[in-house]
A protein has these predicted regions:
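Pocket-forming structural segment of enzyme catalytic cores
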Residues: 90-126
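Catalytic nucleophile loop
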Residues: 44-47, 72-90
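Extreme N-terminal starter segment of soluble prokaryotic enzymes
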Residues: 2-6
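Generic structural signal for residues in well-ordered beta-strands
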Residues: 29-31, 108
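Glycine/threonine-rich flexible loop motifs
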Residues: 53-62, 90-93
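Catalytic-core regions built around general acid/base machinery
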Residues: 63-74
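An anion/phosphate-binding loop that grips the pyrophosphate of nucleotide cofactors and donors
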Residues: 41
Length: 126
């Protein structure tokens, strides 16, 4: 099986952090916004850092939604990271009225403030 993993560049996201992480484990990442390259990819990664509404707007503007949906329905390996995963749902509390890709039924919901939120981020060790 090929070590090549195609990372979708839609103008937002942590592209180069993901690219470096994949390289560190021996993968061969390809960063692209070219629909033809994405269509031919064996494995696809949709990264994400940003706001749900802005990301969906960028995907629409870039014309990548059809090739993403075709890839998802084809059954080839597809990984959404963080916001990239959230975009696969029908919508998000973060952007009321903005439709997601709708591959998964449901909406990304905001965690209630009385729930304990897991720690995310980096800590400095000495």
């Amino acid at each position: 099986m090929s070590k090549k993993i195609t990372i979708i560049d839609y103008g937002m996201g942590n592209l180069y952090s993901v690219q470096n992480a994949l390289r560190s484990i021996g993968a061969e990442p390809v960063v692209t916004s070219d629909a033809a390259v994405i269509a031919q990819a064996e494995k696809i990664l949709l990264p994400g850092v940003g706001a749900f509404g802005d990301c969906m707007a960028n995907l629409e503007k870039s014309g990548l939604i059809p090739v993403i949906m075709d890839s998802l329905h084809s059954g080839k390996p597809f990984l959404g990271i963080c916001l990239g995963m959230q975009l696969l749902f029908e919508g998000s509390d973060e952007a009321p009225g903005v439709k997601g890709l709708g591959f998964f039924k449901g909406k990304v919901r905001l965690l209630r403030t009385e729930l304990k939120i897991p720690h995310m981020g980096w800590n400095k060790l000495e």
